[in-house]
Amino acid sequence: MSESSVNADTPKNTNDVLNGAYQSATTEPEGQYRSATDNPSLYQVPTHGSLYRNLSNSASAYYPANGNMNSREPANELSDISSLAEKGELEPPMAKLLSDPDFQGKQFPTVEAPELFIFELAPDSPSIALNWTFWRKMKTTSIYAYASLTIAWGSSVLSPASATLAKKYHIGMTTSLLNVSLFMLGYCLGPICWAPMSEITGRKTPLYIGLFLFSVFQIAVATAQDIQTIMICRFFGGYGACVPLCVVAAAFADMYPNRYRGTAITIFAAVIFVGPLVAPIVGGFLTKSYLGWRWTEYITSFMGFLSIILIYLFCEETYLKTITENKVQEYREITGNQLVHARSEEESLSARDIIMNYLLIPLKMLATEPIVFLVSLYCSFVYAIIYLLLEAYPVIFQEGRHFPLGVSALPYIGILVGVFIGCGINCLFEPWYFRQVIKAGNKPAPEARLPPMMIGSFLFPAGIFWLAWSGYYTYVHWIVPTLSGLLTGAGILLIFLQCLNYLLDAYLFRAASVFAANVIMRSAVAGGFPLFAVQMFHNMGVGWAGSLLGFIATALIPMPFAFFFFGKKIRAKSKMTAQF
């Protein structure tokens, strides 16, 4: 039989094959085979790859593995092609492809229908992260939350050793505090690279690279013999550590619909604050013990490497574009058909495109989007207060009340409890938010995220004023300033969390970039606060230094109310929200 006759009679699609609907074939003389649409038969060819390359037919060669590969005789009679896969009579890769629900019932391309060469996942595909089962999502959510906790822990675990470092290397206390500030500076610069990478390669690749850098440089800090090495390695550790800050929240947006996304981001926000608050407690006791400050970094490194292992073993890609491209690549490897492709693969990215459309997007958002700038500014202030309090609490409790190292960090527990109270308050608002989403036609309702932030805007300055004046009078029992953390922690969590949720709902299709913009600003602010915290509390006194922060927090109270009433109008004028 000539090649042209084969080309004319070869099946045009595999809908019936993939649905297991092929019936028994009737043997016909050579040259008189009917097409699959008339008589659904399977034909053996030397290789399925050659069939696809020569005839441009996709996934039609679901043929038995046994038989004469040099003849074009009809395959064994098939009543149910899936039974062949069970019997092992199909080549394993083809059997795997046949069992994949993403390829079942799909019409594949022919030269007459070239538009079908573009592969897209169905909206209800189980491969899409949004359609995963609850436990499948929880597995990835838990591991990503642990990775976020690890890098947040690493940002402050060395803070209690600042005095030890100053004494050991004969430097001033302000210079020693650079171990926190330089880590935060790495946080600030990293998102310019990592967030765009996650929108090109997927979420997992930058996580691997970033967490590896973070973990390696923690070991470098632990083994450093001079202060210069410590500071440089802290910076590069922060540069790698910022990946979960940009990518994890975006991955949660990939997995969770509007109704549950707020709860997922609550988990993320909680671990971002739990890490910096718990780490100084552990770090203080380690520094004071026979293990010494170096083990704060060794332990952090072990935690980072464990994150990488867990992500590699148990986490799946969540970014839809990357999932689709991986599916297409798997299909091409099995079938040999190089013509099928994902729509995203039609994009041709030049160096200029990558710079303008990816690398500079976070900076462009900060410069041109009032919502991104103002919300990130408020978020930055409350986030930076956490790192300022890491230096202010030792002044209040270690210097003022003579608490020993380690014990002086225990009052952070008050803020920690406040953070969990804030999580509870936020969860109470989730049903109300979901009703607003339904009213909006099952679309994100950014302004409906703001009522918890309104509550937090009052709790936050109240807690700061409470700490300032109860901490100023040293004869006041230590539990009183400690309890101020309940209001401070709850306020910080409610403001920070709803800032993230508001930005996510408003810029959902650029989630990684908008979070990168937020991380850049808040890390820059948080990196500077520890440098002047001690001097401010020494020179102004605990009462007035705390009051200054309280006055700034009070001045920011109107911000969530302004966005609640006018945010929709502001977003309507935004070119970027319309573009995305």
Swiss-Prot record:
GO CC field: plasma membrane
Chain positions with Phosphoserine modification: 99
Keyword tags: Membrane, Phosphoprotein, Transmembrane, Transmembrane helix, Transport
BP GO terms, sorted: spermidine transmembrane transport; spermine transmembrane transport; transmembrane transport
Pfam family, one: MFS_1
Biased composition (Polar residues): 1-44
Protein's cellular compartments: Membrane
Membrane topology: Multi-pass membrane protein
Keyword Phosphoprotein: yes
InterPro entries to which the protein is assigned, alphabetical: MFS, MFS_dom, MFS_trans_sf
Parts of the chain that traverse the membrane: 143-163, 177-197, 207-227, 235-255, 265-285, 295-315, 370-390, 405-425, 450-470, 476-496, 511-533, 546-566
Ranges for region Disordered: 1-45
GO terms of molecular function: spermidine transmembrane transporter activity; spermine transmembrane transporter activity; transmembrane transporter activity
Domain of life: Eukaryota
Family statement: Belongs to the major facilitator superfamily. CAR1 family.
Name of the protein: Uncharacterized transporter C36.01c
Species assigned in the record: Schizosaccharomyces pombe (strain 972 / ATCC 24843) (Fission yeast)
Lineage: Eukaryota, Fungi, Dikarya, Ascomycota, Taphrinomycotina
